[in-house]
Amino acid sequence: MNAVGIEVSKGKSMVAIMRPFGEIVSAPFEIKHTAGDIHSLVELINSVEGESRIVMEHTGRYYEVLAHQLSKANLFVSAINPKLIKDFDNDSLRKVKSDKADAVKIARYALDKWQNLKQYNVMDELRNQLKTMNRQFGFYMKHKTAMKNNLIGILDQTYPGVNTYFDSPARSDGSQKWVDFASTYWHVDCVRKMSLNAFIDHYQNWCKRKKYNFSQSKAEEIYGKAKELVPVLPKDAITKLIIKQAVYQLNSASTTVESLRTLMNETASKLPEYPVVMAMKGVGTSLGSQLMAEIGDVSRFTHKSAITAFAGVDPGVNESGSYEQKSVPTSKRGSSDLRKTLFQVMDVLIKTHPQDDPVYQFLDKKRAQGKPYYVYMTAGANKFLRIYYGRVKEYLSSLPES
């Protein structure tokens, strides 16, 4: 029974090997994340008599190299939430923070939780890919929003309000009607310098070329508004270049977002719980894949309260003696990305109001009681996660073992 504790950092790690009752098999030593050092570590672990289990914190992306390579060497590897390691065995007044001390602490954690350690496996790699894509998706969504606001800010000086003319959703290639329109009619003079009939013909040809729906009443409305607008920047080559560059940057970010959205759905469809998640109300191919990316493997949660605590939407408790606080904020100690996705799901439910859905019924009930927005949204997210946990776990248990 050998516990291998690994304190992972960027490019290198500290390793300690222990046995029960504090027996030190190998004092903490450093290895580089190179093929040679990892091979030497595998040989050392295999040379130690008895069963060995390796535990490391899943800190950022640093641990993945070791977890992957050690798993390929047929060793038992378990990646643990750093919060669990931090809170483990804090029974000393001394505060020691070093890689060597942390490696020993992780090894002691492995010994204490020996029977409950979950092995890192190939499915975890697929989920890690999905989670990485989701984080990239979030990054590019923020970038897209910044580029969109930048373009609108410039257009307010050449064609105010043009971004409000169309509300069509983005296409699969990331293009949007208002952006394409602003790219062609980048200045208000591009519209009002033409006659009404000339603009209608030009706009109709543009819609046909770009494969958008044409409406004559919309064309007349656009032309009428253009007559009243007052631009700030002149209609010249410099202004056109500024706008074209802003449009290009927005289209580039939007294309990346949509390609990631498609790839995430394709990856999520390989997970066993995909059909169950897609069948839930408020969830589509985009939010569904984001949920699966952030929640991960449901089987690692022992009960419903564990998954709500992981998301940070579990109700807080503040009691001491005879004092008991009635309204306590949620813990918010879990994944902020998961909470964001859950709030988006709740928003979809409120907008679509499926009357037969228990989560929507719960949300509607809390709203009718006059609960504040964040209270009923968080409560709905909590209920949704509990239902998610129950349905997915029941479905996974019904599948034949592979």
Question: Model-derived features: where do they sit?
Answer:
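A detector of single, family-specific signature residues
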Residues: 1-402
